[in-house]
């Protein structure tokens, strides 16, 4: 599986910025490198964080390092996993801190509601393969 780098679903500043980068030699090199990779690359939509949290609605930014390295877990939002997936250790730790400091209890790993509320959940590396970053 190869990620979809189309910018059609991006709006405003995100779309302009990403399209500018993708047209640059560095952006083209990145896409070529990932396209030529023989392993599966995920998440399927690496710009999902930018799609779900328009620039004008960003209220907080939470950076992750890179997508989860297990197929099916990486969903394009830092720390988030698709509904029904087992919570990864990093997300369990976040939930423990939330419970201890704010008495907020959370058990599901789909954080799309955080993105809708203005939380930009952005990994500093947008794509990965099984067991590695790309």
Protein language model annotation of sequence segments:
Residues 1-19:
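Generic N-terminal amphipathic, Lys/Arg-enriched alpha-helix
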Residues 15-134:
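A polyanion-binding, active-site-adjacent surface
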